[in-house]
């Protein structure tokens, strides 16, 4: 078992019954010229987040944790995005940006596009699971819940973008399904001002889960490995 120092209190978990979730680390969310950038959100500080996720993924894989990568988006015709009868049609900033800038139609968050692809630095490995998702939450219209339950996984460690949107949405839904959710704060990034990051982390540590960081996470896993060897 591993005990991770976190806020508001430490949490103990078995790495082999825990999944590291990498949320939407796509060009759309982390790269200049991607959807968030084109929609007016600041992505200039995402590079350290990418590096921290690399570190967390390496440590988690070494410890025997399952790695799950999410990609947010829809088919090329945007049928999966929902039409005017869906609130997603009205609230998705990607869809609104394309309606306001018709030349971008078909380029944002469309499966197969550069925007949809994971950033170059983050490459899933054999044994990892890559899941598409059509909405903010990774539990909605995906096999995530059955994948986790069939493996006896009850603890989820979250990284990715955006903390205040897809990360928090997935962690909240996991909470309602009796999963223990931990966010590594320096391996996440918000969509919007910095206060959005702080508010999301406050919500998570106060109501829905736990908050830690990459160095503490890696140290905890390393200590567990040494203990097993001893």
Swiss-Prot record:
Q: Which terms are listed as keywords in the entry?
A: Hydrolase
Reported EC number(s) for this entry are 3.5.1.110
Is Cell membrane found in the keyword set? no
Specify the enzyme's EC class, one word.
Answer: hydrolase
Q: Which GO terms describe its biological process?
A: nitrogen utilization; uracil catabolic process
Q: Which Gene3D superfamilies match?
A: Isochorismatase-like
Q: What induces it?
A: Up-regulated by the nitrogen regulatory protein C (NtrC also called GlnG) and repressed by RutR.
Question: One GO molecular-function annotation for this sequence?
Answer: hydrolase activity, acting on carbon-nitrogen (but not peptide) bonds, in linear amides
The cross-references to CDD domains, in alphabetical order and at most eight, read: cysteine_hydrolases
**Which reactions fall under this protein's catalytic activity?**
(Z)-3-ureidoacrylate + H2O + H(+) = (Z)-3-aminoacrylate + NH4(+) + CO2; (Z)-3-ureidoacrylate + H2O = (Z)-3-aminoacrylate + carbamate + H(+); (Z)-2-methylureidoacrylate + H2O + H(+) = (Z)-2-methylaminoacrylate + NH4(+) + CO2
* The keyword Hydrolase is annotated on this UniProt entry: yes
Family listed:
Belongs to the isochorismatase family. RutB subfamily.
The UniProt entry, under PANTHER family, shows: ISOCHORISMATASE-LIKE DOMAIN-CONTAINING PROTEIN, PEROXYUREIDOACRYLATE/UREIDOACRYLATE AMIDOHYDROLASE-RELATED
The UniProt entry, under NCBIfam families, shows: RutB (TIGR03614)
Q: What does this protein do?
A: Hydrolyzes ureidoacrylate to form aminoacrylate and carbamate. The carbamate hydrolyzes spontaneously, thereby releasing one of the nitrogen atoms of the pyrimidine ring as ammonia and one of its carbon atoms as CO2.
* Name of the protein in question: Ureidoacrylate amidohydrolase RutB
Query: Which species?
Result: Escherichia coli O45:K1 (strain S88 / ExPEC)
User: Source gene?
Assistant: rutB
């Amino acid at each position: 078992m591993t005990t991770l120092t976190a806020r508001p209190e430490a949490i103990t978990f078995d790495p082999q019954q825990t999944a590291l979730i990498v949320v939407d680390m796509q060009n759309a969310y982390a790269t200049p010229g991607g959807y968030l950038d084109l929609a007016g959100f600041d992505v200039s500080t995402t590079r350290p987040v990418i590096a921290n996720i690399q570190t967390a993924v390496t440590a988690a894989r070494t410890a025997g944790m399952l790695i799950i990568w999410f990609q947010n988006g829809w088919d090329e015709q945007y049928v999966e995005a929902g039409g005017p009868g869906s609130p997603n049609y009205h609230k998705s900033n990607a869809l609104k940006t394309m309606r306001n800038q018709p030349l971008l139609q078909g380029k944002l968050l469309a499966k197969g596009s550069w925007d949809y692809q994971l950033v170059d630095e983050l490459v899933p490995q054999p044994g990892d699971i890559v899941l598409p998702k059509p909405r903010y939450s990774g539990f909605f219209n995906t096999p995530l819940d059955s994948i986790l339950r069939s493996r006896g996984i009850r603890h989820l460690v979250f990284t990715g973008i955006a903390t205040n949107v897809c990360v928090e949405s997935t962690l909240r839904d996991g909470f309602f399904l009796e999963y223990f959710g931990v966010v590594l704060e320096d391996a996440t990034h918000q969509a919007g001002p910095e206060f959005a990051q702080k508010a999301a982390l406050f919500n998570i540590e106060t109501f829905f889960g736990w908050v830690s960081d990459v160095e503490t996470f890696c140290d905890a896993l390393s200590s567990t490995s040494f203990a097993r060897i001893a």
